[in-house]
Amino acid sequence: VDKLIVEKTIPDHCFDLAPRLKSIDRYELGVWGLDPLQALLQPFRYTRSNVHSFTILTESKQEVVAIFGAVPVRHNHKIGTIWFLSSDLLDKNYLYFLKRNKKWLRYLEENYIFLSNYITEEHTRSIKWLKWQGFKFSKPLLVKNV
């Protein structure tokens, strides 16, 4: 188990992580018609205020483990879409991550009055993690006939 560090995302982190995304994350992006690299670079395209993107790296090798953040919706910078995309390196460091991730969620929450996102029902581990974090789920939605 390696120590994990968090720093502000730079585009190179996105280029590093995109080809190594977990298959469940690639699947979920595909449901929305998104390419992994485009999705990871999306926060850099926004000119809105209150955009946050952070990278989790292994301390020893500086390997990108995950990228996460929140982006405000178009007409209200206090309502955000939260997201988290990771590589298989997260599994190797999952307990370390779990013990330290709540402070980053609290940081994102401080910047918004409401955070939301959509998740596929196949993403069971993330659903458990989100519930553990205190997120509430609404009724299922049909997306593009999937």
Locate each region found by the language model.
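A short beta-loop-alpha structural element at the N-terminal edge
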Residues: 2-19, 25, 30
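Short active-site oxyanion
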Residues: 3, 113-116
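Active-site rim helix/loop that mediates acceptor-substrate recognition in acyltransferases
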Residues: 30-51
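Conserved beta-hairpin
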Residues: 50-69
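A conserved beta-strand-loop-helix scaffold within acyl/acetyltransferase catalytic domains
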Residues: 68-77
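Conserved acetyl-CoA binding element of GNAT-fold acetyltransferases
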Residues: 77-92, 96-97
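Conserved acetyl-CoA-binding loop-helix of GNAT-fold acetyltransferases
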Residues: 93-107, 128, 132
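Conserved beta-strand-loop-alpha-helix junction that forms the acyl-donor binding cleft
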Residues: 115-131, 136, 142-145
